[in-house]
C-alpha cells in the first residue's frame, strides 16, 4: 500500500500507526517581499506552536506555509495560524502585496509504523509513516525506502516467498531509517517543539552568532540534520541544557 497518510491497507491489516501526525497548510503566492533566493522561517506559539512557518521562493512565486500537531493548536486550524502570521505587525509588510495562486493542506505522518511489512503486504512512503520529523518532507524518504527494499522484494517475488519471516527480514533493512527518525525527532523536540517562545528567542540569538552560523554552514545539511544537532548540543555551552531532552533517543535510537 502506497495509499497515503490515512492508509486503508495499514488500517485493514493492523500494521500499526505512525508515531505522530502533523497537519500542514501552504499557499503559493506572488508578491511576497523577501530577499531573492532566501528562505524565511518564522517560529512562535501564535503562528506555529511547537513547529515553524516558512516562506520559500519557487521561481516567480513563493510558498508560504505552517505546520503543527493538532493537540498543540488549541482548536485552531493551520489556515488561522497562517492568517495570523500574515497579519502580524512585525511581518505584515512582507505579505501586503501577496496574491494567492494556489493552496494545499494535508496530514504529515512521521515515525515508522510497527510493522511496515507483513506476509504479502508492504507499506510505502506516507502509509508507512516515513515523513521527516524535522521538515515534514516525504518524497525523499519514500524513494530511499524503494531503493533499499526493492532488490530483496523482487527476489522474494521471483521465489514466491512473501511469508511473514521473509518480509520481516526485508523490514530489517529499514531499521536504520527508523532510528534516524527517532534521533531527528529528539533533536527537533529539544530545539523547537518543547521550547517556549522565550527559549526560542534565546536559541535563535545563539544561532545568529558568527561562529555558530559558520558551524551551521560548514556541517549543516537539511537532509541529514543529526550530525549538526549533536555537535551543537556538545560544543555550544548555551545548548547543553537541552541535552537531557534528547540524549536518550539520540544515543539509543
Show which residues each predicted segment covers.
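Predominantly flavin-linked oxidoreductase catalytic cores and closely associated redox partners
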Residues: 1-95, 109-113, 129
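Solvent-exposed, flexible loop/coil residues
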Residues: 33, 45-47, 59-60, 112, ...
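A general structural signal for short secondary-structure boundary/capping elements
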Residues: 42-49, 70-74, 89-93, 100-111, ...
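Short acidic (Asp/Glu) and glycine-rich catalytic loops that position anionic groups and cofactors
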Residues: 60-62, 125, 183
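FAD/FMN-dependent oxidoreductases across multiple families
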Residues: 72-153, 157-158, 168-169
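C-terminal helical "tail/cap" subdomain of flavin- and related membrane-associated enzymes
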Residues: 154-253
